[in-house]
Amino acid sequence: ALEQPRRMPVGAVSRAAMLASLQHTNYRIFFFGQIISLTGTWMQMVAEGWLVYNLTRSPLALGVMRFLHTIPVTLFTFYGGVLADRFEKRNILVITQCFALILSLLLYFLTAFGDIQVWQVGIIAFGLGMTNAFDIPARQSFVVDMVGKKDLTNAIALNSSVFNSARIIGPAIAGIILSRMSVAACFLINAVSYAAVIMGYLTMKLPLKANRSDKRN
């Protein structure tokens, strides 16, 4: 008689399905890097707001900073998508993360050792917005390259959970650091988080691809 195939417990199947995209090594590196990076980013957002309000005592200034962060993303994300289609996505992400690291370090040094002015914070905010305009489309399309279409839905769900978790954890950590240390420490920690992500990208092993010019021909 034919032996009936063994059935896996429902709980085991559901857990495996929930974490399906993590079977891809590159996505695992990306996933844990995002946890670190997004937590640092939300820490910096809270610290930046605290700094701007202490410099100006103006709620309007806080709104202007949010505007400077978001307007480049609104205006230039399309160009970031075009760039992501034409060049290696990982290289774009390494470059954008390096720019973000430099800007966070600049914010740290100005806050810790200089007489920081609100206009300087504004320029850095705009620079980070420009960085995101090119980082976001490359990062989103890079997920498809890492997991393929089969596990894409699961990867999107995990990315969403990471984003929302970081949105809770990051501000909480920022509050502790602001009360125990300084606002500059938040900026420094965020810079370190970018460095961790850059190292993760550089350790990924990507499959060799045909030359883009060959593909067009």
Regions found by a protein language model. Name each.
Residues 1-217:
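Alpha-helical transmembrane-bundle signature of multi-pass membrane transport and export proteins
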